[in-house]
Structures are given as structure tokens and as C-alpha cells.
């Protein structure tokens, strides 16, 4: 745990008018610092470590989809959570990625201070980089606490972002197949 980070949380409590020496807050700066480090541990990870060689030769050239990957991240503007799910697809060209690695790639980028638009693109580009896929598609749907708990306070709004690369961008048929399979096409 980073002692400087803990001290900053103590200063935040004082700045809010709280007494960091009161019983309920004695360990709060340390706990908050530890929680923030956990929530942002994606900074300490690399794509190479995450994939860890889990690329496998395959003749499959049909769409691979991992949908409903739960995620949470922290909005870089307010440090408040956004929570949702990612749907990731790619079209292999000779190799497939270990199934859990797709979710780990999502988590690596989500565990950073982030905006959803950038998160979506980072995931898509990472999957393309690792797999050399003919196409990659990522859709993220999430609820943002910065919009629910402050500002306009809209409790039921969701944000959808998508990035389509390669075949998913070039072929409406491929894109529509993906959207239909994740339940986002009529």
C-alpha cells in the first residue's frame, strides 16, 4: 500500500470537514488507498503478461464472440465507477485466443482511470494486435455513477459504445451478424 496515497485520503477527509481520528474513519485512508490501487491495477499489467502465450493454431475463420463480460471501471473525470458489460468478437486468421484472455484484456484496460469510449477502442485494438484478426468488434454497455449520483442524476440511463475494425467495419453483413448474436439487432 502506498503511504502517500493514504495520506492524501486523510487530507480529503479533513477537507470534507471530517475528523480522520474518529472511530469509524481511523483506517479509512489506508483502506481507501488500498481499494484505489486495486481498482486501478491495470496500470501494472501488460498485454504480453495477460495473454501469456495463450494463442492457439486454428483453421477456424468464423466469428468468435465472448459476450456479457462484466466490467467496472472508474471514470477519469470524477473517479466514480461505471459498471456494465463488454461484448467482444473477432474473426481469426490462423490462431485463436484463449477464452479467458479476452476477459482479462477487458479487465486490464477497465482497471485504469478511463472513459468508456477509449476503453472500447483499447480493447478492440489489443485483440487485433494479439490475434492479427481479420476483424474485431467491441460493444460496451454501461451505467455511469457520475451521471446517476451527481449532475443530471438519471438513474436508468445507459451508455453504449462500439468499435468495429476490419471485416466488422467493412461488411454490414458481418457487423449485423455480430449485433444479432449479442442481442443488439432487430
Swiss-Prot record:
Please name the Pfam families in this protein's record: GTP_cyclohydroI
Keywords for this entry?
GTP-binding, Hydrolase, Nucleotide-binding, One-carbon metabolism
Q: In which pathway does it act?
A: Cofactor biosynthesis; 7,8-dihydroneopterin triphosphate biosynthesis; 7,8-dihydroneopterin triphosphate from GTP: step 1/1
The record, for InterPro entries, names: GTP-CH-I_C/QueF, GTP-CH-I_N, GTP_CycHdrlase_I, GTP_CycHdrlase_I_CS, GTP_CycHdrlase_I_dom
Question: What is one GO biological process annotated to this record?
Answer: tetrahydrofolate biosynthetic process
Q: Give an example GO cellular component term for this record.
A: cytoplasm
What's the catalysed reaction?
GTP + H2O = 7,8-dihydroneopterin 3'-triphosphate + formate + H(+)
- Kindly list the GO molecular function terms attached to this UniProt entry: GTP binding; GTP cyclohydrolase I activity; zinc ion binding
The answer to whether keyword Nucleotide-binding applies is: yes
The protein's matches in PROSITE patterns, at most eight in alphabetical order, are given as: GTP_CYCLOHYDROL_1_1, GTP_CYCLOHYDROL_1_2
Q: Which family does it belong to?
A: Belongs to the GTP cyclohydrolase I family.
Spell out the NCBIfam families in the cross-references: folE (TIGR00063), PRK09347.1-2 (NF006825), PRK09347.1-3 (NF006826)
Q: What is this protein called?
A: GTP cyclohydrolase 1 1
Q: Which organism is it from?
A: Pseudomonas aeruginosa (strain ATCC 15692 / DSM 22644 / CIP 104116 / JCM 14847 / LMG 12228 / 1C / PRS 101 / PAO1)
Amino acid at each position: 500500500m502506498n503511504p502517500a496515497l493514504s495520506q492524501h485520503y486523510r487530507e480529503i477527509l479533513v477537507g470534507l470537514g471530517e475528523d480522520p481520528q474518529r472511530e469509524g474513519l481511523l483506517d479509512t485512508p489506508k483502506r481507501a488507498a488500498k481499494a484505489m490501487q486495486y481498482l486501478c491495477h491495470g496500470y501494472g499489467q501488460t498485454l504480453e503478461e495477460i495473454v501469456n502465450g495463450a494463442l492457439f493454431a486454428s483453421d477456424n475463420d468464423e466469428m468468435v464472440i465472448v459476450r456479457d463480460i462484466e466490467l467496472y471501471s472508474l471514470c477519469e473525470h470524477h473517479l466514480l465507477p461505471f459498471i456494465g458489460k463488454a461484448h467482444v468478437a473477432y474473426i481469426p486468421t490462423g490462431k485463436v485466443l484463449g477464452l479467458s484472455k479476452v476477459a482479462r484484456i477487458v479487465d486490464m484496460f477497465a482497471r485504469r482511470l478511463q472513459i468508456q469510449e477509449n476503453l472500447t477502442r483499447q480493447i478492440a485494438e489489443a485483440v487485433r494486435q494479439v490475434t492479427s484478426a481479420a476483424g474485431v468488434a467491441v460493444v460496451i454497455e454501461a451505467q455511469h455513477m457520475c451521471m446517476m449520483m451527481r449532475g443530471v442524476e438519471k438513474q436508468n440511463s445507459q451508455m453504449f459504445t462500439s468499435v468495429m475494425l476490419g471485416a466488422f467495419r467493412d461488411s454490414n453483413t458481418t457487423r449485423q451478424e455480430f449485433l444479432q448474436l449479442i442481442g443488439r439487432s432487430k
